[in-house]
Amino acid sequence: MKVFDLHCDTLSELRRAEMRGDGQTFARNNGHIDLEKLEKGDYMLQCFAAFVNLADPTPGADPLVTALEEIDVFKRMMERYSDRIAPVYRPEDIRKNAEAGKISGMLTIEEAGCCKGSLGVLRRMYELGVRMMTLTWNHENELASPNVVPGNGPIWPCMPNTETGLKEKGFEFLAETERLHIIADVSHLSDKGFWDIAEHSTRPFAASHSNCRALAPHCRNLTDEMIRVMAEKGGLVGLNYCAGFLDDQPSPDLCRSTTALMAKHAAHFKQVGGIEIIGLGSDFDGIGGKLELSDCSKMPLLADALRKEGFTEDEVEAIFFRNAQRFFENNL
């Protein structure tokens, strides 16, 4: 069965591997995602995020440089393995690549703070191929506030930020991303920021890697009200495989990442927002711990868990790739 994944942090890992010179490549590596595993997993499309940590302690770290270097990794991947994987810039590219027997790669950004508040840089990111973007990661920036409250680290589960959302520059970025047809991604955005986008957006938006707060009460997850609004607006949510966003335990160390829990979240999404809202957003190469889905080649395990949860074969296909394919073909 084909797979369409809305989020991974593989570019960041590959950039670090190049800096270390340890021989890890996109063709084959020890992480969750490489080309060999994607082919084994029968992937239709993988979204690759250029991830930036605004609090990077590396001396001289520049968020824009980091993002551009990760985008350069993506470009070189697409060029070197062009017989096996190809980029997506336009809606029709997804089908064209599939018909050519190639996996699709879509470039995204996780932390629009790398643009340093510049609409010119944002437009340049579009020209480089970026087609989806979170306004924040876990740190405040010129655009908006994240869903992690400062000083919230020792608290479990992490409580949501309901007080601060998009700033003036954030609203400008939202308008420009919509004009460019860059998908606004609300994963990592504060609750207030979510509602700002829900109120002011004119196009469908995504939560590329978030789960259900009703099942796992973490600030990174969506409330039922958020799920309903996203469904009404034609949005898309990617199931996140991170244990802390799947399980409801008194300590993060006790949380599990299992396909059964993923299927429970999928069932809740379906109950609240309908089957059409659900996609996959693994967060592979950005999450740790013991994962039942130990890498991207193991996706049949999740398909089996969804069937056991009561999903029909058509619904499993909708979650695995059809919903996401439709969403991007309609909105890029």
Feature-to-residue mapping (PLM):
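Conserved, mostly hydrophobic/aromatic
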Residues: H7, L38, R90, G129, ...
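Short catalytic helix/loop segments, enriched in acidic residues and glycine
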Residues: M19-K40, L301-A303
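Structural preference for beta-strand elements that scaffold enzyme active sites
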Residues: K2-D5, L45, A86, S104-T108, ...
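Active-site beta-loop-alpha junctions enriched in small/polar residues
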Residues: D9-L11, F51, R90, E110-A112, ...
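Short acidic/histidine-rich active-site segments
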Residues: N240-Y241, G273-C296
